[in-house]
Amino acid sequence: MKITWFGHAAFRLDFADKAVLIDPFFTGNPSFNSTVEEAARGVTHILLTHGHSDHVGDTVSLVEDAADASRTLPVVANPEICAYLAAKGAGNAGQMMNTGGSLDCGGFTVTMVRADHSSGGPGSPSEYLGNPTGLIIRAPGEPTVWHMGDTDIYSDMALMCEIHRPKVVFIPIGDRFTMGPAVAALAVKRFLPGVEVVVPCHYGSFPILVQDASFFAQALADHPVKVVVPGPGGSFDANITPA
């Protein structure tokens, strides 16, 4: 599996014949240093953790571009976000699911799990877009990935690890809207047994967020987990033991 981070909480997973975008916030993302065309080339699915504009991002335009090319680009999201996207012109691209549920996407499975945050559209708080979530992505022969979404620490992260056995975790560290570096590091140490790789995210993109991952990485220097900080636009291969 090849993993690319585009800054903020936007990731791309490439494996087998799939190219999966998670929270594709490109336009307006100060950390984004590529082009939308390049970042989305060959994309087969979009997954959304919640409805804030810095996570829904370019979803509608990407779905419209796919439709113009006579193909459907599935968007996995909660029912409220799917209804919102349909109203914005995304048609029937939405693939509805909700917390605790799993969805077979044909070649991989997505499970929605808890995140402690909020969720609303660009007009929020007037637009309620369901509960925020994290996403567990499983594919045959690949390490299980957990994108935590935007969240604070919670003790049942340990239960999520017991149930889903993720090997790679994307964890927010930016503070103010999510947990900060110290709390995120504590979450890794206390509640993420068996995780082999953690990738910090949701930082450095806006001035009000923590600007770098150095404290987070230093706090985990003596912990048996690999901290990968790819930098915006950077990629790495997750060649680790599949779950």
Curated annotation (Swiss-Prot):
SUPFAM superfamilies xrefs: Metallo-hydrolase/oxidoreductase
Domain of life of the organism encoding this protein: Bacteria
Keywords carried by this UniProt record: Hydrolase
Pfam families, per database record: Lactamase_B_2
Any one GO molecular function term: hydrolase activity
InterPro entries: Metallo-B-lactamas, RibonucZ/Hydroxyglut_hydro, UPF0173, UPF0173_UPF0282_UlaG_hydrolase
Family matches, as PANTHER family: UPF0173 METAL-DEPENDENT HYDROLASE MJ1163 (PTHR43546:SF3), UPF0173 METAL-DEPENDENT HYDROLASE MJ1163-RELATED (PTHR43546)
Sequence similarity: Belongs to the UPF0173 family.
Protein name: UPF0173 metal-dependent hydrolase Xaut_3786
Naturally occurring in which organism (per UniProt): Xanthobacter autotrophicus (strain ATCC BAA-1158 / Py2)
